[in-house]
Amino acid sequence: MPEEAETFAFQAEIAQLMSLIINTFYSNKEIFLRELISNASDALDKIRYESLTDPSKLDSGKELYIKLIPNKTAGTLTIIDTGIGMTKSDLVNNLGTIAKSGTKAFMEALQAGADISMIGQFGVGFYSAYLIADRVTVTSKNNDDEQYVWESSAGGSFTVKADNSEPLGRGTKIVLYIKEDQTDYLEESKIKEIVNKHSQFIGYPIKLLVEKEREKEVSDDEADDEKKDDEAKKDMDTDEPKIEDVGEDEDADKKDKDGKKKKTIKEKYTEDEELNKTKPIWTRNPDDISQEEYGEFYKSLTNDWEDHLCVKHFSVEGQLEFRALLFIPRRTPFDLFENQKKRNNIKLYVRRVFIMDNCEDLIPEYLNFIKGVVDSEDLPLNISREMLQQNKVLKVIRKNLVKKTMELIEELTEDKENYKKFYEQFSKNLKLGVHEDSNNRAKLADFLRFHTSASGDDFCSLSDYVSRMKENQKHVYFITGESKDQVSNSAFVERVKARGFEVVYMTEPIDEYVIQHLKEYKGKQLVSVTKEGLELPEDEAEKKKREEDKAKFEGLCKLMKSILDSKVEKVVVSNRLVDSPCCIVTSQFGWSANMERIMKAQALRDTATMGYMAGKKQLEINPDHPIVEALRQKADADKNDKAVKDLVILLFETSLLSSGFSLDSPQVHASRIYRMIKLGLGIDEDEPMTTEDAHSGGDAPGLVEDTEDASHMEEVD
């Protein structure tokens, strides 16, 4: 008695995705075949890999292939592979109840106008079958389980049951019941066209069951018998030859040895035709391969719907032999920096035999956007993942891949337009490389691009910056911050720009990590204009003026330090300000204001490190600013004047904000500003507040008159 089918509901996101696929019009439905062939190829890769360590895995079927069977009579297209197959739990989980991470991301991309052909990149390619089929059955046999069949007409549920029909041995058979308006996908010519376009570089034979004709000589009696048999079978789907009378031979009197007349008839028969006889592209001479061929191979390898940006095809010979084909895609994948995501961008082959596609030791993490193939002559076929980690050959391959990738990016820099596209997508990867890869740091630094105070809207390289440096300029000056507008208007760049020195604007959070490791470039030290100890080239007159200013404002600096106490490490006369009265700088080895902001946003930040790294601040005052000069005169007249204390605190808090820091008590600072606005508008301090104000108890600290308020201001950071 046959086992009853179990019914399962599709996971909500998968049901949504299927509904989207079925109910939306897509013009390029043909990608369904690419996706199903790609999945079949993956299944074949898995069984071949398992068989390297356990050859008995192939006892259930030695031949590894993909077969396509169109049946116009039944209206079905069948895709068979002799891959690893699926167990019952695989069928339930992989085809419906567990959504992959890409399901939601793909739906969002689709709704945002992305192409349906992107589906394979998100790991949900199987569901593209419903572009052309209204019902799908998947029969599968894994070595570790019985044969089961999965079936769904996409109505929100699917069934799985044991299958006692024709045994597969091992592998998967997908039957697509083609929609009435999609029957052109049953035509041989259409299938050949799609396979040639999308899947010609699959590493296993793709066989298509085709119908052919041949002429055959038979006697009249045999012809009559075969004709009758053929008529009897004409409605049945069969591989038996079909007979068609093509008239008698030219020699009507020609007879066989029994004296019977002979006829030539046309016989129809079916046979497998291999569609992808092209040998692996990476084994061919690069000079013989067109850009179109590289493009087709890239798409079949990655399921990308766009062409690659550039390609590097090379071979290494000598003590170690391997061939490789490396591609840079046009855009970043949606999950590029997901830590838990297994990378499968570079497929590792040994002597044309696929070994694995998620070998983490093949290329460093910061280059995880590179896609391609590596085919080694020296690795053992049955190498395990554990053995790979210790393998010296792999380390040499990795070193060569990194070197060739650097060459590829360097070649790309010569094409400004394409490099701009590349940099917009992958600049974070290059910067991560500067942070992580000390051996290639100098080379990666050449690839970085930034806005500067002299570059306008264009990006420029550090090499361009160095070539424009003034004769008396010793350092590369830079500033980090949130945006180009913010840093270009910062108080820190005033004097540097006024002196004609160019400043590099670093406005991405990752730049803070880059400069921790990129201390110099081409012998020029990188100097932050927001850190203490900024030295600008100066002549004797400027030196003399600076010494005079130091002496003149020494008393004010000491007074300000005593008022601000532990809030600052010291107060000094600045050599970097022009228009601003003061600014807050950090110590050489502490965090900049921008880094402090980034670290405060970290959910898992270390508060002990925060206190240590963010603790040291220095207040710099501008000796040429009228506010500072007036404050000095007021302090010299009476250093105990409460107004001086109030103004010092107000200046300090305002400079914290303008220097990119945040206030611990913004409300107290705001209250002081409101009090100043009141004074500016001539509103009497003693004027009674409205009822709401009285209830809120919103008593703001005074600025000048109220002694108690003034001392309160002194205590608040």
UniProtKB/Swiss-Prot annotation:
It is found in: Cytoplasm. Residues 225-245 have a biased composition (Basic and acidic residues). Changing residue 171 to S: In strain: pseudo8 and pseudo9. Keywords: ATP-binding, Chaperone, Cytoplasm, Nucleotide-binding, Stress response. InterPro entries: HATPase_C_sf, Heat_shock_protein_90_CS, HSP90_C, Hsp90_fam, Hsp90_N, Ribosomal_Su5_D2-typ_SF. Its main location: cytoplasm. A motif (TPR repeat-binding) lies at residues 713-717. GO terms for molecular function: ATP binding; ATP hydrolysis activity; ATP-dependent protein folding chaperone; unfolded protein binding. Belongs to the heat shock protein 90 family. This is Heat shock protein 83. It comes from Drosophila pseudoobscura pseudoobscura. The gene is Hsp83.
